[in-house]
Amino acid sequence: MADNAEKDKKDNSFMMKLATLIVDKRKGFYLIFIVLCIFCVLSMNRVKVNNDLTTYLPDTTETRRGLDLMDSEFTTYGSARILICNVTFDEAQKLADQVEEMDGVSMLDFDDTEDHYHDMEALLSVTFDEEADTEATQQHLDEVLDALSDYDVYYSSDIGQEERDADDLNNDMIVILLLAAVVIVAVLLFTSTTYAEIPVYLTTFIVAAILNKGTNYWFGTISFVTNSIAVVLQLGLAVDYAIILAHRFMEEHEDKDAREAVIVALSKAIPEISSSSLTTISGMVAMMFMQFRIGYDMGIILAKSIIFSMVAVFFLMPGLLLTFSKAIDNTHHKSFVPKITAVGKFCVATRYIIPPILIVGVIIAFFLSNKANYVYDTNTLESSTMSDNKFSVSMVNKEFGMVNQLAVIVPNGDYEKEAQTLKALEKLDVVKSCQGLGNIEAMDGYMLTDKLNPRQFAELIDLDIEVADMLYSAYALDQSDYGALVSGVSEYEVPFIDMFLFIYDQKESGNITLDDDLEETLTDAYSQICIAKDQLLGEDNSRFVLELNVPYEGEETTAALDQIRNTVAKFYNIDDILLVGNATSDKDLGDSFATDNTIITVLTALFVMIILLFTFQSAGLPVLLVVTIQGSIWMNFSLPYLLNENVYFLGYLVVSAIQMGATIDYAIVITSRYMDLKTYMPIKEAAIEALNQAFPTIVTSGSMLVSAGFIISYVSSNAAVAAIGLALGRGTLTSILLVLLALPQTLLIGDITVSYTHLRAHETPEHLV
């Protein structure tokens, strides 16, 4: 025993010294981890979660520029679409009148058209007098819903939507983590050889997860997607590291006492785990290069999770293994993982059949995956589970349709041009309705931006003509329009909105006095005009709000956007026009998808091939392994095409990186075992035995990642998160099947090529033994 330990020290002196320090100072490390965990638990609430994917669009995209401009120049008041079921029209009208009189409600649309009433169901379109993100607006919405609580009511609103989405995600995560915990324990019970290993694994996993989640505040804000899946993915991606150390310990413990076994096992596991983690981290790093910046958000958090997992395995788990060593010795049981010799024999027998089929299959999968229907809007997706919030929104959309709103932003300063543009837009078949200052009626058929002379204005608001002339003269003087004063103001025309606001300001300043009736009319109209002005007229730009007759995304929508842009371009310079809405956001995401897809595919493959090149000292092996996993990625995303399902673009990008970066480890395990075994046995026997030796590791890690993906898919009520989970579950399962049923044949057939492409005489690295 002493001789073996001495040999290990000579072979790996630095690692042995480091491992000895970690094991002997384990109590100190326990204390450090306890302090860090307490700090991280307290820090979790400091993390802000962003539920808006548009904030991750590149700054150069039209949608991002438009959203930033609207935030700075325009006010968007809170609104809600409220569905009341099983009511007559008269009942609905009474309720609408009641709601319209409530505090905080500035406007309510309801009539007897199909857009607002049909089949005993009514839709109230309510606009409030404050912005959507204020507590007052949320309170007003709650009061409206309370007033309608005696009826069967559903609603869709931008007010408090982020909070409702966050609550849904938090509730989903509790269920996901509980189910994942059950699956993890079940898998560990099935694949372990001693029951006392399980608390060691679980403690290590939990600590690593707490450290990662508690340090997310370093980045200020993280996306809801990252927040939802990071913990579960961390467990699935990093479980290999704990398994490697535990297996090393069990091997060394056969002829060494517990302390020496842990030290030697750790000294050997550190380089092996570090090497294994590089491929996974490379996939995360590749995501960070995406134009769509959520890739950076997910990539850096998941890369951090891998690092913290290694920290927990290197500095916490050795002490736990030593602490639990007696229990581990006393709770040994027979391994439940079966030998898969039959699969190995199948691989040997089909070594000339499967590789050609694999090549053809990969080529077909490549073309099919490119033909899949990629979607960019979560409204196009459906989740298996629906929260009360999502169900309420779906009911409104089901009965009265989704609202596809588009904002058109143009330079302001010419009301006549705006009115002409709005009239042109109203004639388009793709436009259901459009609103701007130029087509909002003020009084008696006059629009807010129509120009009126003093007589017209006086007749409109029932004002003496002499008073009107005086007010117009004061306005001309205020605007330094001396030409109007010289030529006389009787023909001087001023836009109604400008003259109205000028008179109101003069009244408020005490410069003029109006009779009671006129003052009441002025006051009542002022708030409505201000609401319209705040939403549609900015410091430098005007905004038109359109409702489209097309889906959120697709060729029809793209054509509609082009038609709208070309129509507006008849009146404005095309470079000064901005279109902003779900439709443009989806288009921008689609435009960046092709580039991001290339970045993910090329960088992950390149990073992994470089790592494998140094690991195996062969130019041929990395190509075989990467092609196998890339083939599984294409096969994964060809399934939706065959099943006539939509593919969420973010799911494709994220899972492509994870699948290449993480599941390549399964191929590495089999390949490293095979390369070692074939040095002292025939290659056919080596392939069979390599599968038997690698299967426990693959089934443990793989089943956890597959389960994590499918649990996320079927539990999450957020369609985007669910789509990523489904793609992850399918992708990992595809990789496992391909690695077990096609990689051995590829290795056997490519053995000669691999031998010829060795950079030096083959010597299996010790950490891959």
What residues fall within each predicted segment?
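A short beta-strand structural signal in non-transmembrane regions
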Residues: 78-86, 96, 110-170, 405-412, ...
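Extracytoplasmic
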Residues: 60, 64-65, 73, 85-127, ...
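Adenylate-forming
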Residues: 70, 396, 757-758
